[in-house]
Amino acid sequence: MTDPYLSHGRTPDDHVAACPHCRAAVALLDRPEPALAPPPALRGTVLSTARRRRAPAAPGVVTVAAPYAEQVALMDDLLAGLHGEQWRAPVDRHGTVEGLLEHLTANDAAIARFMGAPAATGASPHRRWREQAGALLERVSAGSEVLLGVEVALAGVRPARAPLRQALVQRTFETWTHADDIRAATGRSRAAPRAVHVHQIAEFALALLPRALKGPRRAVSATVVLTGAGGGTWTIPLSPASGHVAVLLSAEAVDFCRLVAGRWPPGEFPYAAEGEPGLARDLVEAAATLGCDR
């Protein structure tokens, strides 16, 4: 095909110079597109999705890292949706939502330091918590299963040490508990973890229960039956020389976890017991002391 401009002795540039319509079209095409700032929530959304989908290499690490990653992502989403006034909403034990998040960040810090995570430097409480939790997850996910057996200090009023594996379950537990605290303080509905994660949290708490009982240890065992999502049956020796099962205690699994978190007064906690009623009460009261609040 012969170019009509050339066939009339004119180049395209000559035509554009003489034609106002073409000159305007070329100017529009040559104009650079203005740079657009990404939406403010984009970074948080991408990070939350990445944390949910992160798959640590070692199967044993997945078991404890994935539940924590899920609760971190849910907490991150929750905090991203708070406006200024909601950060000052009152919260029992910690004053405000902001104070509660600072408490959680401080409890997470012991495990983060153990894992070699750098100190968080974010400008806001949300940013500092998120940076630290993300760094902790990255290091745990890249670590080996052997590391999970190393003893570390647990959070809480009672001094206790446990393998890193259990400390990470506690991080999952406390993150969920405080997310529910924030939901309650800001008019949102509570949200329980997945059933398999509830089961893991309940098992973690029941392993600590004998140490939390007041008075001399008795040479008996207790069977605890937790019903509903995440439930199961555990028989717990209350001393190294435990003999027969002295009590069978039944309760709902998520309710039991909330009792352990200190979110259900032991005198009001719904449970059923067979055997020694006094021992059942002692177990419920001991469970209520295992939370992470100080």
What feature does the model see in each segment?
Residues 1-64, 71, 82-99, 113-121, ...:
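Structured surface interface patches that mediate subunit assembly and partner/cofactor docking
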Residues 76, 134-137, 256:
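Conserved C-terminal region and hinge/linker of Rieske [2Fe-2S] proteins, especially
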Residues 78-81, 139:
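Generic, well-ordered alpha-helical scaffold segments in large soluble proteins
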Residues 99-106:
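Basic/polar, acidic-poor N-terminal "presequence/leader" segments
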Residues 109-111:
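Acidic, His- and aromatic-enriched active-site or binding-groove loops in soluble protein domains
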Residues 123-139:
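Long amphipathic alpha-helical segments that form oligomerization/scaffold cores
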